[in-house]
Amino acid sequence: MVGFTVVALSATLSGCSIDSVIWGPDGARVIQTTEELVDDMSTGEASGLICDESVADLGEATDWVGLSAGEPEHFVADYWEKQAALDPQWSINLEGLPEGLSPGSTYPGDVFYRETDEGLCVIDIAWSTLVDVG
């Protein structure tokens, strides 16, 4: 608990967000962009965060309700072979579950971003399948 307090105090005094302290400025940007994406998608708004050449299945607004940004990381092609050809630079898992899911239901699980001159844009979304509720 003391460690968290020190991190929070450092973030406050330096003007940085906690996400910037933990994940660095680039990781914090991925988290912030993902929160914007979830907000856009869960309200049914068209998001300006989608790359022109995106292959992402965006699903329905209800698929996004209850989700939030997880942990950002630089893209790892060995783990995400399907997305490697799309040349993303970042991936982030989504945390939480949309309401009313039952085993076998699918939901957005990971978002893949490409860096552009305008900022990050979504190039793909990997959907996860709920195995068990409990």
Model regions: which residues?
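Exposed beta-sheet edge and beta->alpha loop/turn motif
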Residues: 79-134
